[in-house]
């Protein structure tokens, strides 16, 4: 898709997700100006040079700036934050909490200084707590700060379900709620294969409860599985693609319903401005609507446990900041 207006997108963090997303943005041509910032000044510059060479093969022009100076993000339409320590094998997201909170604070202060009108997507883990802290430190409106998680979790669930049933993943639609972690909650009555809910597929014997439970567990451990296989590093293709999905919905006012971490104040019974993964309409104004599903008692209990973990992480940050 090619943009019909001047669009500036900035990426903060030049690791694998940031680098992959920069390449995807260049190929898609959805922004006229791309900024890539990292504390390691040469890394974003080197990656952008490599990306420019790759795009030249296809005859695609790109205007991009890389470096360590945050002043370059001034006037950005959208900013994607991937900066932070990566998760290593055996490391929980909670292990990263305070270290990455310090990173987010620094990034947020620069966003507030240079691009207070931007739409900000946070990818840094522990995701839901980091999005909350970004909102707190940046002072941006709650509708302009979101976390990328639910769309990735939903994609993983759809992928594993499609593989198990030997159908195209394009025939699968999934809804995953809750925090980005071990208590993420796929909603079986709203997740479908060929228009038939997973709940109904279980009822008619096409799927067993045991099979679905195994798929859910593999979804929850999807990131960890990749970390173990890679030995060094974590997932980056799917997270980058998830960010693209969110960026396109915002920049082109697509108003797609996308599961992502958003600030809640009453929806799903969550108060206090916590950021939790729920389906939301993303359009030109950022988060334009939160879609609220009716949950069963069991789903409600799992969701509340997930919210409790997020609340605990937020409390730890609040007490130490």
UniProtKB/Swiss-Prot annotation:
Positions bound to NAD(+): 13-18, 38, 100, 123-125
GO BP annotation list: lactate metabolic process; tricarboxylic acid cycle
Cited InterPro entries: L-lactate/malate_DH, Lactate/malate_DH_C, Lactate/malate_DH_N, Lactate_DH/Glyco_Ohase_4_C, Malate_DH_type3, NAD(P)-bd_dom_sf
Catalysed reactions, as listed in the record: (S)-malate + NAD(+) = oxaloacetate + NADH + H(+)
Disulfide bonds: none
Keyword field: NAD, Oxidoreductase, Tricarboxylic acid cycle
Chain sites annotated for binding substrate: 87, 93, 125, 156
GO molecular function, one term: L-malate dehydrogenase (NAD+) activity
Enzyme Commission number: 1.1.1.37
Enzyme class (EC, first level): oxidoreductase
CDD domains per UniProt: LDH-like_MDH (cd01339)
Catalytic residues as annotated in Swiss-Prot or TrEMBL: 180 (proton acceptor)
Function text: Catalyzes the reversible oxidation of malate to oxaloacetate.
Family annotation (PANTHER family): L-2-HYDROXYCARBOXYLATE DEHYDROGENASE (NAD(P)(+)), L-LACTATE DEHYDROGENASE
Family: Belongs to the LDH/MDH superfamily. MDH type 3 family.
Protein name in the entry: Malate dehydrogenase
Gene assigned in the entry: mdh
């Amino acid at each position: 898709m090619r943009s019909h207006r001047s669009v500036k997108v900035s990426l903060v963090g030049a690791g694998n997700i940031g680098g992959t997303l920069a390449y995807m943005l260049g190929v898609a041509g959805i922004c006229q100006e791309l900024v890539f910032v990292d504390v390691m000044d040469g890394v974003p510059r080197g990656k952008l040079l490599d990306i420019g060479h790759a795009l030249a093969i296809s005859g695609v022009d790109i205007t991009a700036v890389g470096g360590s100076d945050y002043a370059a993000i001034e006037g950005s339409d959208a900013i994607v934050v991937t900066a932070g320590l990566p998760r290593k094998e055996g490391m929980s997201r909670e292990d990263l909490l305070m270290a990455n909170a310090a990173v987010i604070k620094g990034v947020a202060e620069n966003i507030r200084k240079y691009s207070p009108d931007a739409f900000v997507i946070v990818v840094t883990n522990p995701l839901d707590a980091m999005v909350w802290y970004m909102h707190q430190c940046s002072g941006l409106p709650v509708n302009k700060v979101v976390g990328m998680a639910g769309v990735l979790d939903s994609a993983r669930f759809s992928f594993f379900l499609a593989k198990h049933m030997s159908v195209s993943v394009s025939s699968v639609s999934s809804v995953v709620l809750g925090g980005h972690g071990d208590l993420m909650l796929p909603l079986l009555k709203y997740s479908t294969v060929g228009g038939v809910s997973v709940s109904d597929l279980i009822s008619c014997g096409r799927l067993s409860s045991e099979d679905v439970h195994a798929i859910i567990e593999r979804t929850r451990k999807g990131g960890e599985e990749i970390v173990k296989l890679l030995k060094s590093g974590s997932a980056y293709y799917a997270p980058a693609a998830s960010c693209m999905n969110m960026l396109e919905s915002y920049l082109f006012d697509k108003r797609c319903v996308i599961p992502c971490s958003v600030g809640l104040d009453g929806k799903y019974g969550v108060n206090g401005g916590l950021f939790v993964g729920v389906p939301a309409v993303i359009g030109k104004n950022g988060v334009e609507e939160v879609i609220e599903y009716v949950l069963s008692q069991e789903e409600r209990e799992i969701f509340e446990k997930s919210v409790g973990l997020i609340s605990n992480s937020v409390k730890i940050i609040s007490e130490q900041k």
